[in-house]
Amino acid sequence: SNCRVSAFYATAHKYHDTLEACLSEDNIPPSLYDGLIETVHENLKPLHEYIALKKETLGLDEFHAYDIYQPISNAADSFACDFDEAKVKVTAALSPLGYDYQAALQEGFDKQWIDIYENKGKRSGAYSWGIYGVHPYVLLNYQPRYNSISTLAHEMGHALHSYFSNKSQTYINSDYSISVSYTHLTLP
C-alpha cells in the first residue's frame, strides 16, 4: 500500500516519521506544520459560529460540506462590477502590501498579463502560470460578480508571488512549492 511505501521511504532515509519525510520535499520543518495546525485549531470558533448561523439561516436540519457554498443573502451582488472597476477594488484592497506590490499589480493590469473573459474553446476556471524570465500570465473567466473580483485578487497574488520570486532569485532558487504558494495568500 501507499502507506507502507511512505513508511519504508521515511525509514530508509532516516526521517523521524512519514510526516517529516513528506514535508522535507518542500523544506518545511515539522514545527511549522504543527504550528499551522495548532493555529487553525485555536481559531475554529468563528468558523463554527458561521456554520451554525448559516445552517439556521438556510433552515437546514443537517449541514453538509457543499452547504458552505450556498449564499445566505444577495449582499455579494452589490459588489458586481465591470473589470475596470474590479481592478480598482483589488488595487485598493491590496494597498497595505505597499508601493512595490501596487506598482507590480498595476504593471500586470497595464501590460495585459490577464486573459480576462470567456471565449469559445477557453478552459474554465482560473489560474496563474509563468516561466522564469517572462512575466506571469493569469487566466480568468471574468463575470461581473463578487466571486470574479475575489478570484482576480487571488490569481494576481499568485502572479505577483512569481513575479517577485523571479525578480529577486536566481533561476535555480525562484521556484516554490504549492505549500508556500498558498500560505502567502492569507493576509491578516
Q: Across the structure, where does each feature detected by a protein language model lie?
A:
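Cation-handling catalytic/transport regions enriched in His/Asp/Glu
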Residues: S1-L185
